[in-house]
Amino acid sequence: MSYPQGYLYQPPGSLALYSCPAYGASALAAPRSEELARSSSGSAFSPYPGSAAFSAQAATGFSSPLQYSSDPTGFPSYMGSPYDAHAAGMTGALSYHPYGSAAYPYQLNDPAYRKNATRDATATLKAWLQEHRKNPYPTKGEKIMLAIITKMTLTQVSTWFANARRRLKKENKMTWAPRNKSDDEDDDEGDGERVKEEQSEKAQDSNETSAEDEGISLHVDSLTDHSCSADSDGEKLPCRAADHLCESGSESKEKYEDEEDDGDEEDRVLPVKPATSSPLTGVEAPILNRQQEGSPRNSNKTNLDNGMSSSSQTPASKPKLWSLAEIATSDHKHPNLGSVLSSATSSSAAHNPSYPSSSLLGRHIYYTSPFYSNYTNYGNFNALQSQGILRYSSTAMTANEGLNQTVLSTSSMHKHTSDSVRTASNQLDQHYRPTNYESKKDPSEVCTVGVQPYP
């Protein structure tokens, strides 16, 4: 407990000290020893001749008792002797380092902290480096040990070794093999040079590896591009009917244009068009492809469908952008619908035996169907599949009834050409939306929604 200089502190026993003739009122007005011990110099040994505390004390009439005598009996009981280390006023001051400050014990001029690496410190580091020429990478424990010995910081030691390795490498005296950075050296600030050295020395080896990796990645990209937009020739017929619904679906537009370009002539010759991969029809679509098509392009689609059959249970396993294009542009959404509508489509079975119209219902029901409000559950679509591959809810059952009515009402249109198919698709949009449209979402937002996982 310290008091400012000039503060008159009178303990209860100080009233009896007025009888002391040698120390009158000047003794009581003098600064106390606690102020002397905790003076602004920050040192415990401030009341020496020449110090500010000593001169302030001498000015008040204490020049005679402050001689270098070992007898402190001339001091009152409430004043601790500046030479007595066991006085109450000195204990707090002696707890600090005599050369450091109490507020910040590690100042720049503190001998415990070394700004520059001295000759003896570098000699220790050089000796360690000479002994470990084949592996000049000290571990974390060795760095701490060297930092304690040389009185340097851990960053200084790391930087010194990094500079030494760079210097030896520049002088072609490198006798060690570059190695990877160990885990205990990740947080060192001076290891940036080491990483640069290792990267430059491993450049040739990494070039070969990166070339191989690049070839693999190019191969994967080519496969992905083939699956996304196989041979996009630019036939924009089927996508015109839904351009107002999908402004941002450029990828799906390219994919769908390509498929419709190849399947435009097959629509008049072959009974079934090739089905692309889709999480909804990943099981039955390859069967149709094997029965009807034999071209190499369709065999590639069959392989894609086989790959997607496993993901029909978990379509979230491939959360890519082209998955949306695959779903939005699949030709045959529901190949088992022919069994559901066998009586209604028997007259047109020669034209479309498995599905009435791929461009009519396969695409636009995905965007304009009223049960799309539950678009996070693919079970809504799978209510149409007779084998029940995926789980569906009661909402899908009610939506299935409305979809069957729509398919029955539009099945008579499927004998026409592609021009009449486009007209029928517009009629389906106008017929289907006002009846039981419950979705509160804008259909233009559908294209931006990726593949959603099952709840």
From Swiss-Prot:
Record has Transcription regulation as a keyword: yes
An example Gene Ontology molecular-function term: RNA polymerase II cis-regulatory region sequence-specific DNA binding
SUPFAM superfamilies recorded: Homeodomain-like (SSF46689)
Keywords: Developmental protein, Differentiation, DNA-binding, Homeobox, Neurogenesis, Nucleus, Transcription, Transcription regulation
Subcellular location, record wording: Nucleus
Main localization of the protein described in the UniProt heading: nucleus
Compositional bias per record (Polar residues), positions renumbered to this chain: 289-316, 420-429
GO biological process: brain development; cell development; dorsal/ventral pattern formation; negative regulation of neuron differentiation; neural plate development; neuron differentiation; positive regulation of DNA-templated transcription; positive regulation of neuron differentiation
Biased composition (Basic and acidic residues): 192-205, 247-256
Signals that turn on the gene: By a combination of a neural inducing signal (nog/noggin) and a posteriorizing signal (retinoic acid). Inhibited in the neural plate by foxd5.
Tissue: First expressed at gastrula stage 10 in a large region of the dorsolateral ectoderm that includes most of the prospective neural plate. Subsequently expressed in two domains, one within the anterior ectoderm (outside the neural plate) and the other within the neural plate. Within the neural plate, expression extends from the midbrain-hindbrain junction up to, and including, the spinal cord. Expressed in the placodes. Also expressed in specific and overlapping dynamic patterns with irx1 and irx3 during pronephric kidney development.
GO cellular component: nucleus
DNA-binding residues: 110-172
Positions with biased composition (Acidic residues): 257-267
Disordered: region residues: 172-214, 247-319, 418-455
Family named by the database record: Belongs to the TALE/IRO homeobox family.
Function, as annotated: Acts partially redundantly with other irx members in neural patterning. Required for formation of the posterior forebrain, midbrain, hindbrain, and to a lesser extent, spinal cord. Acts early in neural plate development to induce expression of some but not all proneural genes, and specify a neural precursor state. Also up-regulates repressors that prevent neuronal differentiation. Patterns the neuroectoderm in both the anterior/posterior and dorsal/ventral axes. Probably dispensable for pronephric kidney development.
Stated name of the protein: Iroquois-class homeodomain protein irx-2
Organism of this sequence: Xenopus laevis (African clawed frog)
Gene (name only): irx2
